[in-house]
Regions:
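Basic/polar, cationic surfaces and motifs that engage anionic cell-wall
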Residues: 2-12, 16-21, 29-91, 127-150, ...
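Active-site acidic/histidine clusters and adjacent loop/turn architecture
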Residues: 81-116, 121
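Conserved, mostly hydrophobic/aromatic
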Residues: 124
Length: 274
């Protein structure tokens, strides 16, 4: 798993409530193919792209389907918050795996047993063949219900992928090491699809830089679709992935549309403290 994807946030109830009052949020995203370097840092225009079609829900491999051993995880849930940003990771594991589900199981055990997480840190993982895997468990789903990682009100389970920046951020990990090698086209296509779907559902501007307040009350300025290295001391999601973030944002914006910038003092995350 990626270096420094060691970040579950153990926050006291008082701090959770304070963050809810100011509208805390987190970020996620990063990608890489040879599509050019990351673009300059534009502010959200506040406009909406006209005639954008609804992004269809992607197929998601459930925890049961990839073989999660539910007996090893902690049933404690840190909290819930709607996605406001996307953070892209790589697992920094060998490329070209033949059995992506086995790689997900390995990462799950690494996070839970070795790093003492309550569960796998990522919200979603994507294999080299483009399969999208359910990450951290949110709840029991009904028959035929899509495993979104959210409660019934659209609040997402808080992950453990970027320490101090987990609340409100969707952590997506591409399986592999993308320092010198780019992800497969299939993986990139699934990444674009997944982010566009989340962006449209949660009204995240793919080209924007909405204000974000970390769990330690630090005010951060970064893209709504960002790489782990943009907000942490790490090489994740790999040099080749990070170089294509600007291109990725544009691809997502074409599919999902644009949305008005959120102001930090106007956001109110719906926290549920267990």
């Amino acid at each position: 798993m990626c270096d420094l994807c060691n970040g579950e946030d153990a926050l006291p109830r008082r701090q959770f409530l304070r963050l809810a009052a100011v509208g805390a949020v987190t970020v996620a995203a990063g990608v890489a193919l040879d599509h050019g370097t990351a673009a300059a840092k534009p502010k959200s225009s506040g406009s909406t792209t006209p005639k954008v079609e609804r992004v269809a829900a992607p197929a998601i491999v459930t925890r049961a389907q990839w073989g999660a051993d539910e007996s090893i995880r902690d049933n404690h849930i840190v909290g819930w918050a709607p996605f406001r940003k996307i953070i892209v990771h790589h697992t920094a594991s060998p490329n070209g795996v033949k059995d992506p589900a086995a790689a997900v199981r390995f990462g799950y055990k690494l996070h839970v047993i070795d790093r003492k997480f309550t569960d796998i840190g990522y919200n979603f993982l994507i294999g080299p063949d483009g399969e999208i895997f359910e990450g951290r468990r949110a709840r029991r789903y009904g028959k035929g219900e899509l495993h979104t990682g959210e409660d019934g009100a659209g609040n997402a389970i808080i992950g453990g992928h970027t320490k101090g920046r987990n609340a409100g951020t969707c952590g997506i990990a591409l399986i592999g090491n993308f320092m010198k090698t780019p992800p497969s086209n299939a993986a990139i296509e699934s990444l674009i699809h997944l982010i566009a779907w989340e962006a449209q559902r949660h009204k995240i501007d793919p080209m924007g830089r909405d204000p974000y307040i970390a769990t330690d009350s630090t005010h951060l300025d970064f893209f709504n679709i960002a790489g782990h290295r943009d907000i942490g001391s790490t090489l994740c999601p790999g040099t080749r992935m990070a170089a294509s973030l600007g291109w990725l944002r544009k691809q997502v914006a074409e599919r999902a549309g644009r949305f008005p910038e959120r102001k930090a003092d106007m956001r109110r995350l719906a926290w549920v403290i267990n």
